[in-house]
Amino acid sequence: MNLYFLFFISTILAAKPFNSFNKTSLIDEGVDNDDDIVSKRAVVIDYCDTRHPNNLCKKYFEIDSYWNDDTDCFTNIGCKVYGGFDIIGGKAPKIGTVCRLKKGKNKFGYCNSKGNCVERDFIESFGVSIKIKGISHRGDDEPACPLYENTWINYGKCNEPYHCGTNYGLFYANKRKLNYFPDNGQKCNSKYEIYGVCYLGRCHGTGNFSNGEVFSEFGTIFKDVEIVTLSDGKNSSKRGKHKNLHGSKVFDSNGIYDIDPKNWKIEDDDKDITVHENAGDPKSDSRRC
């Protein structure tokens, strides 16, 4: 009984109080041995991943999204209680998460529903749009590229009309040649628009080439990119249903799959509408950049 009491007290002392937790994104810097490029990898610790099958992962637990093996789609996004006790049980593939196709190679794909890391197929659409406007802080783990500035795009169609990509494979947009990746700093489109990509829960971008910026492995972290879901949740190619906050707007993915994205965009009177998910709803994902 005394031993149990001592263990209980030590556990309480080891735990950090929630209100003292610093909600920041940690950056781990390392050197890429292939081409001596300094890489940065974000570790999300500011929210819990409600997509995880462990429903005990609530606000009092912190997220550690750092993969030991980013080729393994069955690696958990760890949900840990303050004090470091790992309460995760079982493993599940993070469908749609960016993953490394082969160890030691800077070429990336996505995790499919079978847990395999595969190259992106442009027949599929994962139902996420991106808008370069507004402020939000949580992200999805999938690549995206904008078609027109300040408009919603379906990145399953982002190969039209641009061929956008990076030499690290975080942007796939050349349907005819999937292994096409520009060199560092190579222009991705004629308008020099900023591209955004969410990776490991934070939103990254390639930079604005008109200002002389260049590609980096995961890009520059952006906080002004919003994600909206376009999915019906019926299969791995479409993200799950989400309840949106009052006043927000969401699109039905089934209604846009066969529409050329250059033919649809936000109407003028809707440009300032903030579209996001209800992170407070346990049935809703909290994927926002």
From Swiss-Prot:
Its main location: secreted. This is Toxin tox21A. Has contracting-paralyzing activity in insect larvae. One of its GO terms (molecular function) is toxin activity. Posterior glands which appear to be connected with the stylet through a series of ducts. It is found in: Secreted. Residues 15-27 form a propeptide.
